[in-house]
């Protein structure tokens, strides 16, 4: 916690470069990404803006205006805020920028494009303590999500959802519905 009290976790160096650089390099290698949007609270927005200055790819930083845990919007409302503020009307890949991955997101993006549908990544997680710290879904025989729980005390299933989502263009416009 002391490391991230006054500095954003996605910009912490790992192996000589910020976590976000590892993610961006992977995404750049896929050939699918046109630009990046970083959504930040007001406290850390300046750090992200400074980080973007040295980037060869297009990055837009959106300051959501919040400054405390009590006033933060939450992930879905942050996405909605950025979509409205930037008038985004294209496919979106949404990822949490504080994850260091041992795999490429390219396969996930290709899968979503081949299926022609919005997708969430999921994996089996059988440890209850870990299930209680993440999102858990259940799905039907067609892989359609039938329930979604954020950090459940009594999970209905064992499919953990890391923060990696591909949204089709037509589903981006429906983010408002998910909030209501």
Located regions from the model:
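A phosphate-binding catalytic loop at a beta-strand-loop-alpha-helix junction
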Residues: 1-3
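Residue-level detector of flexible, active-site-proximal loop/helix-junction positions
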Residues: 7, 18, 66-68, 126-127, ...
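Short acidic donor-binding/metal-coordinating loop in glycosyltransferase active sites
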Residues: 96-97, 180
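Conserved N-terminal catalytic core of the sugar/cofactor nucleotidyltransferase
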Residues: 5, 12-13, 17-96, 105-107
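Conserved core of the sugar-phosphate nucleotidyltransferase
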Residues: 102-179
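Short, glycine/serine-rich, charged loops/turns that create anion-binding
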Residues: 43, 99, 126
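Short intrinsically disordered coil segments
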Residues: 76, 179-180
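Residue-level signal for pocket-adjacent positions within structured domains
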Residues: 6-9, 132
């Amino acid at each position: 916690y002391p490391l991230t009290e006054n500095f954003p976790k996605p910009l912490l160096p790992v192996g000589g470069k910020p976590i976000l650089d590892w993610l961006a390099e992977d995404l750049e290698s896929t050939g699918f990404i046109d630009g990046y949007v970083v959504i930040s609270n007001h406290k850390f927005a300046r750090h992200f803006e400074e980080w973007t200055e040295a980037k060869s790819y297009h990055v837009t930083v959106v300051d959501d205006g919040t400054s405390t845990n009590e006033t933060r919007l939450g992930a879905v409302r942050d996405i909605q805020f950025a979509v409205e503020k930037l008038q985004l009307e294209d496919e979106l890949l949404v990822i949490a920028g504080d994850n260091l991955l041992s795999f490429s997101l390219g396969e996930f993006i290709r899968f979503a494009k081949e299926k022609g549908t919005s997708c969430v990544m999921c994996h089996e997680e059988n440890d209850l303590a870990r299930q209680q710290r993440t999102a858990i879904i259940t799905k039907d025989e067609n892989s359609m999500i039938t329930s979604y729980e954020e950090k459940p005390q009594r999970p209905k299933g064992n499919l953990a959802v890391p923060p990696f989502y591909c949204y089709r263009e037509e589903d981006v416009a429906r983010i408002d519905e998910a909030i209501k």
